[in-house]
C-alpha cells in the first residue's frame, strides 16, 4: 500500500518581494566603459590546472639574497626545480666576492643561459622577499640580454626561499 504525500502549493510572492527582484536586475547593467574585474586565480588553482594540462608550461623565478650569498631558482608550475644556482655553484668562493654587486649579475647570467638551453622563453612570475628595486632591475636586465622575459614581479613577505617549490635532487643541476 502506497503512502500518498500531501500536495503543497507554492506561496504567492508578496508585492514587496517582486519590487526587490526588479531593482536587483536593473542594478546589474553598468555604464558602457565599465570593465569587469578579472578574477584572481590562486596558486593552488593554477596547480590543479597545470596537472590537467601538462602541455601548458609556466615557469617561476625565485630570488633570495642572504648576507653572504645569492640564490636564483627556476621552477615549473607544479614546483619541481628546473634550474638552481647560487654564488657557490658559479665558483664564487670568498665571502668578499659573494657580497659584491657583480655576483648577482654573474649568477643571473648563468641561470639565464641554462634556462635558454632548456628552451625556456618566458618566466611567468618573479618572486623576491625584499622590495629592493635595484636588485630586481639587474636581474631583469641580465635576463633580457639572453632573451628571457619576466612577465610579472611579486614581492613575497614570507622569507623562505623554498616557498611553493619541492626540491628534487634529480631535477637540480
From Swiss-Prot:
Subcellular location: Mitochondrion
GO cellular component: mitochondrion; ribonucleoprotein complex; ribosome
UniProt-listed InterPro entries: Ribosomal_uS11, Ribosomal_uS11_sf
Biological processes, Gene Ontology terms: translation
Primary location class: mitochondrion
Keywords, in A-Z order: Mitochondrion, Ribonucleoprotein, Ribosomal protein
Similarity field: Belongs to the universal ribosomal protein uS11 family.
HAMAP family xref list: Ribosomal_uS11
Protein name: Small ribosomal subunit protein uS11m
Biological classification of the source: Eukaryota, Amoebozoa, Discosea, Longamoebia, Centramoebida
Amino acid at each position: 500500500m502506497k503512502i500518498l504525500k500531501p500536495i503543497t502549493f507554492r506561496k504567492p510572492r508578496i508585492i514587496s518581494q517582486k519590487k526587490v527582484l526588479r531593482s536587483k536586475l536593473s542594478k546589474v547593467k553598468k555604464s558602457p566603459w565599465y570593465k569587469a574585474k578579472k578574477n584572481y586565480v590562486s596558486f593552488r588553482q593554477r596547480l590543479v590546472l597545470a596537472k590537467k594540462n601538462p602541455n601548458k608550461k609556466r615557469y617561476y623565478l625565485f630570488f633570495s639574497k642572504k648576507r653572504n650569498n645569492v640564490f636564483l631558482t627556476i621552477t615549473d608550475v607544479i614546483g619541481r626545480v628546473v634550474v638552481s644556482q647560487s654564488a657557490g655553484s658559479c665558483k664564487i668562493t670568498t665571502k668578499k666576492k659573494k657580497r659584491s654587486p657583480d655576483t648577482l649579475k654573474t649568477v643571473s647570467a648563468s641561470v639565464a643561459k641554462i634556462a635558454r638551453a632548456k628552451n625556456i622563453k618566458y618566466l611567468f612570475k618573479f618572486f623576491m622577499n625584499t622590495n629592493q628595486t635595484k636588485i630586481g632591475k639587474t636581474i631583469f636586465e641580465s635576463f633580457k640580454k639572453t632573451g628571457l622575459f619576466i612577465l610579472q614581479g611579486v614581492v613575497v613577505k614570507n622569507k623562505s626561499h623554498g616557498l611553493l617549490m619541492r626540491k628534487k635532487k634529480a631535477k637540480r643541476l
